[in-house]
């Protein structure tokens, strides 16, 4: 029996690693391995039912709460008008989150089944493979003349978010090997990754990737060799100089132009539309503190714009999709309960990562939080699956003792 339990856990890890590797090269297969891993985890938990405990705290809890929130909101506000619409973003996200919480709980609770040093090697292999495949795919797309690299995800922004976190996961796995040559490879990985992110044309990732790479490095090592740091910064500066005119400067000029247009009352730009959506979202939340349906949000927004706020009209273009801010999106549809649970999700996950000295989880959560200020990641199927798999695989790195 013990051998069966061990094999089930190992199979769950194996399937999770494959899903992680395929995140940016085959979204369909990524999703399939994600679900198969969960089904094996459920079977594993059935065998382990006598050992299941709720203490110590598991990051599966905040994930479960977000999933339950989405499902309850859907049943209260959307079910009456459309029934069980399997194509609903919120219903789909709730299903993935609820199932992912099982996977995270299983991998976290029974991580004693795998040797920590062996797990480091497997994680290195998985992230290295995933990073190499994604980078090669992205560079190939760029060589074919694609304006914004998007890899296997048909949205360049989401690809940039996932790629940046995958890259830092690989860098973290290199740090764990405690080898000087691999530290050099980690530096090279960061440089290559930054260049690929520039090719996606995603401003948030371009601005945050290097910053979070530095934060993760400082948090992991607690001290940095000055000479190595200076060499690395010089190389980064060189990449910035070479890439400035073709890749960076156009984005800076675009940002300046969009800000100027918004100040003149024109919100028909990327940033301008976001400002309008955020304003509309906050007003929706204030008017509906306990939540509302997507249809009700659209109807209320139309009336609000007609009644003295025509400068926010571009928000109507995106109101049926999302409002490009994780917190405002939650507040506008799920009211104060949705906002409170989302805050708990981020605070508890980041707090857990800090308490348990888990640099990987902390970095991933910080990027998810910061990216969520200008986009909605937890509704994207590919990104959601990637982050849930990474959260599950990050738990063996936590310095906790099982009871």
Residue ranges of model-derived segments:
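Transmembrane alpha-helices of multi-pass inner-membrane enzymes
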Residues: 168, 364-373, 377-403
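Alpha-helical transmembrane segments of multi-pass inner-membrane proteins
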Residues: 102-105, 115-146, 154-221, 243
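Long extracytoplasmic/lumenal interhelical loops at the membrane interface
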Residues: 268-272, 276-279, 286-334
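A juxtamembrane structural motif centered on a specific transmembrane helix
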Residues: 1-11, 176-184, 355-358, 376, ...
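Aromatic-anchored transmembrane helix interface
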Residues: 36-38, 59-73, 83-109, 122, ...
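Loop-to-helix entry and N-terminal half of a specific, functionally important transmembrane alpha helix
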Residues: 12-18, 321, 325, 351-374
């Amino acid at each position: 029996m013990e051998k069966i339990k061990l094999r089930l856990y190992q199979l769950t890890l194996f399937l999770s690693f494959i899903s992680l590797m395929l995140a940016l090269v085959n979204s369909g297969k990524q999703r399939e391995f994600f679900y198969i891993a969960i089904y094996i985890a459920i079977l594993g938990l059935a065998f382990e039912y006598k050992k299941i405990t709720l203490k110590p705290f598991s990051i599966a809890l905040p994930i479960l709460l977000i999933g339950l929130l989405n499902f309850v909101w859907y049943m209260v506000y959307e079910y009456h008008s459309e029934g069980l619409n399997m194509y609903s973003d919120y219903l789909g996200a709730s299903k993935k989150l609820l199932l992912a919480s099982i996977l995270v709980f299983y991998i976290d609770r029974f991580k004693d089944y795998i040797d920590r040093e062996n797990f480091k090697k497997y994680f290195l292999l998985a992230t290295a493979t995933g990073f190499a495949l994604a980078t090669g795919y992205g560079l190939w797309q760029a060589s074919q003349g694609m304006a914004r690299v998007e890899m296997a995800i048909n949205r360049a922004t989401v690809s940039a978010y996932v790629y940046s976190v995958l890259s830092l996961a690989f860098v973290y796995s290199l740090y764990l090997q405690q080898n000087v040559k691999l530290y050099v490879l980690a530096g090279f990985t960061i440089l290559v990754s930054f260049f690929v992110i520039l090719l996606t044309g995603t401003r948030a990732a371009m601005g945050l990737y290097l910053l979070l790479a530095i934060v993760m490095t400082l948090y992991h090592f607690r001290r940095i060799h000055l000479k190595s740091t200076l060499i690395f910064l010089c190389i980064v500066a060189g990449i910035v100089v070479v890439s400035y005119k073709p890749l960076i400067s156009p984005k800076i000029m675009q940002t300046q132009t969009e800000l100027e247009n918004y100040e003149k009352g024109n919100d028909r730009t990327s940033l301008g539309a976001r400002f309008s959506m955020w304003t509309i979202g906050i007003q929706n939340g204030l008017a509906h503190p306990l939540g509302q349906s997507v249809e009700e949000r659209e109807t209320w927004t139309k009336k609000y714009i007609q009644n003295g706020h025509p400068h926010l009209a571009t928000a109507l273009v995106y109101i049926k999709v999302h409002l490009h801010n994780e917190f405002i999106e939650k507040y506008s549809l799920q009211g104060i309960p949705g906002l409170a649970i989302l805050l708990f999700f981020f605070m508890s996950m980041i707090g857990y990562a800090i308490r348990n000295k888990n640099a990987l989880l902390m970095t991933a959560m910080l990027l998810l939080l910061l990216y969520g200020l200008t986009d909605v990641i937890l509704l994207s199927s590919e990104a959601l699956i990637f982050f849930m798999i990474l959260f599950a695989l990050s738990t063996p790195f936590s310095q906790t003792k099982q009871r």
